[in-house]
From Swiss-Prot:
Localization: Membrane
Domain named ABC transporter: residues: 428-652, 1047-1281
Natural source organism: Dictyostelium discoideum
UniProt KW keywords: ATP-binding, Membrane, Nucleotide-binding, Repeat, Transmembrane, Transmembrane helix, Transport
Gene behind the chain: abcC12
Protein name: ABC transporter C family member 12
Amino acid sequence: MEDIELNSVDNLETKGGKEIKKKEKKIGYGGKKSPEENSNFLSNLTFSWADGFVIHCFRNVLQLSHLWDLASYDKSEYLAKKIAKSWEIEIQKPKPSYLRAGFRAFGKLHCISLFFYSIYVGSQFVGPEILSRMVTFVVESKLGTSTEDPNMGYYYALIMFGTAMIGSFCNYQANRVTVRTGDRLRSIIVLDVYKKAIKLSNSARSNTSPGQIVNLISNDAQRMIEVFGILNNGLFALPQIIICLALLYEKIGWPTFVGLGLMLAAIPFNGLAAKKLTETRRILIGHTDGRVKVTSEILQAMKIIKLYAWEDSFAKKVLDRRNNEIKLLFSFTRYRTILIAMIGAIPTAASILVFSTYYGYNGSLDAGKIFSALSYLNLLKIPLGFLPILIALGIQMQIASKRVTDFLLLPEMKEVQQIDNPSLPNGVYMKNSTTTWNKEKEDSFGLKNINFEAKGQSLTMVVGSVGSGKSTLVQAMLGELETIDGEIGIKGSIAYVPQQAWIINATLKENIIFGKELDEERYQKVLEVCALKRDIELFPQGDSVEIGERGINLSGGQKQRVSIARAVYSDADVYILDDPLSAVDSHVGKHLFHKCFKGILSSKTVILVANQINYLPFADNTVVLKSGEIVERGTYYELINAKLEFASLLQEYGVDENTKGDDSDDDDDKKDDDKKEEKVEKPKQSDKDGTLISEEEAEQGAVAGKVYWKYVTAGGGLLFLFAMILFLLETGSKTFTDWWLSHWQTESSERMESILLGEEPTGLTDDQNLGIYIGVGMASIIVTVVRTFSFFEYAVRAAHSIHHELFNALLKKPMSFFDQTPLGRIINRFTRDLDIIDNLIATSIAQFFTLMLSVLATLILISIIVPWLLIPLAPICILFFILQYFYRYTSRGLQRIEAITRSPIFNHFSETLNGVVSIRAYKKQQENILKNQKRLDDNNNCYLTLQAMNRWLGLRLDFLGNLIVFFSCIFITLKKDTISPSDVGLVLSYALSITSNLNQGVLQAADTETKMNSVERISQYIRGAVEAPQIIDDCRPSPDWPINGSIKFDNLVMRYREGLDPVLKGITCEIKAKEKIGIVGRTGAGKSSIVLALFRLIEASEGSISIDGENIAKFGLKDLRRNLAIIPQDPVLFSGTLRENLDPFNECPDHELWSILDDIQLSKVFKSTEEGLNSKVTENGENFSVGQRQLIVLARALLRKPKILVLDEATASVDGQSDSLIQATIRNKFSNCTILTIAHRLNTIMDSDKIMVLDAGKISEFDEPWTLLQNQNGLLTWLVNETGPQNAIYLRKLAEAKKSGLNINEITQIDQQNDNLNTPPRL
């Protein structure tokens, strides 16, 4: 096979320097067809096609780009087609099974492996038979009675070697098929679960958490690979046992049935243990799902948890679930240990019973029969050893299959009817439509008897108070709700902008283009109308900058504009926009409305949910919702004249009915805007190459010793040491038992000879030898049982400790870690990696130690008995170490790349589940399915290549092991006159086992190293940067700190990461106790950075912040954050109960919670339910509207009774009514607090004591509002003017009223017609 590595330097130099450069760029097999597909019969038989790749891995650090293309028959596209047909047949059955469908699709391939494996199994029985004949040959040669050819020993050597090699060839061909079949079943689960996830109905989604879905594609899918890896061993276990027993009977007669009786007696116990395993595993998986679900939720909301100093509460939530999971894991492990211990002890116990009975019956031992029988008993260890593993994995596979089947049978979303009537214009048509979020729940919110049309070139606006059903109407149009009655139809393509923008982890341009072809002219136009050009100029990489997961390096307004730009660029026919203007600045909102919605989209059907009353006069039609029903519709003026619900709604917003909307667009302001040079600080910065999300790094070289040490100490070093001593005692006692059998037979023969010669026999009697044999054998059994229990007990403790360390370490990580690390990558640690540590790693380590100690014992034993064997053994050992050395480079590289290529699958799943509504709206299902297939193909390429390398090594190790057997026969033949028959039997019986043990031992070593990569990856997260301590014992604030709530910023400089430009540049100011400070500024000016610095989510680079004269840097983070309160822009609720969301530490009595709910006007909502404070909150609070979520978050702040409150654009995403309620509650309840308000709506802060205007990370202006407005060239003046002429007048009156000391309610009565007339100013 041609080595695709770089050729020798000399060869390249003859071609000139340019040629060298050209060749050096092409490393490995990247882009080439898989050599396995092109290889001939001999190359496939010996796996020699992999030779060049092994050398390549030795010379280079392996990269994914070095791998060849995945074979066509292994690609996801091919597998998807195969399973689709099979599942279509299966789903028609009363009780469909996905596993059965998989067997139907790929079972024929597995039949080929059965054929090869049957030949391999047959070859295993040749060795013991030749052993018996070899002993007979030696005995007869010694006695001179042999009638066979004197060279027969050499012929036996060739026969044993030849049949063993045939068996090896067949075994690895069988393995080639089983591995592929297991991987195919794993792949189709990942593919079909993904497809199903983007089709699930809303009721199905509400009952299935993202954590559960991730578990299906990680743990459950992985079971297929694990089971198929040993499936043939299990299928042939019973035939092997029967054949072994039959041959045993042929050798030693009826004592065989004594051993059989022991095995039969163990079956009920094994069956009971297997039953318990099944029950425990099923419950255990449910607990694992729950733990992963909560962990995923916490990781997504880590910023909020840190801001509230809720780490302890949520740690308890996860660790309690983990403790319950560990209890079940202990139970599961103990039942599995019983199986392993019993089946591990049965061969030894059977040997003792069989040989004791044989001796008792015959009165002597025949070396040929005894050691031939011993070989058969050793053969029994293989099927018996695999049975507990197969039972455990089989149970897990059965449960996994059931879970996957149940998931795939969940109801799917019914797509909205596509209208193809050419006479109808594009638009949305709803006729007598009654829909609900969840049909299964009677109290589920929905829409009633909706008749709605939005068609042609029109702008329809949807308004209503909080909880009226505005977003529900949008979801119904998209087909996300379940239809009870009526019809919903859409003509034309759809573009959708959700209330909370969905951003993918890609470049800014890719987020906008969203898979469509690039039309540069349209793209530039879209950037202009969506007000993104200035933002793009701020990034050094322009629109090629990478947008982090969930858009973490963009502000809320930027994310929303990117979302709008995606919709506009799609050039759809119908635009459904769910309150997109709430998250953007006022002047940007006006620009978007006039330039985008009424500009570039003027020829489209636009449906706009809005809380901005001032834009209603520009709508062609307005729809008013109340309690899930349309109560009014018409133009703005028609609705005003009707004086019905719309008029009441205007009063809630404080708008005079006679007022006209501000009909100016931003053309008039553009000149002023251009004159005022915008100095805006960059948003969270990415690195110089444009990347923000860090690539997952693969460690190079062997797994470090400290990783193994980490695992050793995790479960208790002394317990591990105790288990290791027991491993040695177990191997030693078993070897000694077999050696004693040989010694007994030799001594028995010598006693017989002495008696025949009339001499006094020496040594122990046969009965004494029997007693020692039984005693040592029983000790061996006891050691095996104790070792098994102690080691697996240790393993569960280690798993518990590692999870505890990992979770606690993540809670202490700085926010920059979560900004740069995709959620899917972190979740992978808590699913796949932790599953390996929980369930698999201990088995691999135990098998590795058992096998390698057995090999070592064999080599020592046969070298002592046949010293001449050391001559060929030396080069064999050298070859073994060379092969193993080369293989480890290959194996390590592939293992790590396989692990790295697995994370993108989880990342993509996570991203898809967050944006499934957008994906469906834009009809991007197939595009995302192809992305999933590409990621899966990359991962499968690594995995299948790794398995091919295992076969490459295995065959060569088998060859070396078979050589040991061959040379053992050769030297026994050479020394047949001096070697005892019992030693011949002992040497050959052990030599026969060395091939399997050596091969399995090395592969287990590689497998153990692979699984240790999980410990290594988790250790990477345990190490690394951490936040400051939660509590500093010798520097704690007084219990009543802060008493006043004064804040001082002293030359504060802050940057997001070392090496990046500062985002806050020398902030210096003093805020007096109880002052109400408004903070304004353009996007990226540093408003939210002030909050991050105050809460120390990012530490100051220079300068300081003091509260009540105390430098906050000297306190622990918990002491600081628990004494502050924040109402963030995006309201975050957690699955659980209302009580848990309000009071995670359960510190407040019920009456206090109800009192707070009264204050925010939500008590009626919950008092009307039976659960009350225990009302269920679904994941992300999806069973509440955004306005209700924000009110609940306000209630959290009220319960804290803080001296300092921060409002971080807290009312940006709520309607005017909710905004008014929140503002009134804050004024009333927090009058004695210092309040910092980062505002989008200037009317919420114009009555502040002072306003801080930030520009480019510096304080541009800081004074009373009225004073600042006297400066006609000031930035605040410009921002006020941007809100529109009438609203600017109102804002100035607010500032003047504040200066003159008038009450805000008086101001409202004086000038109510101006209140919120135009866009509530957004900054």
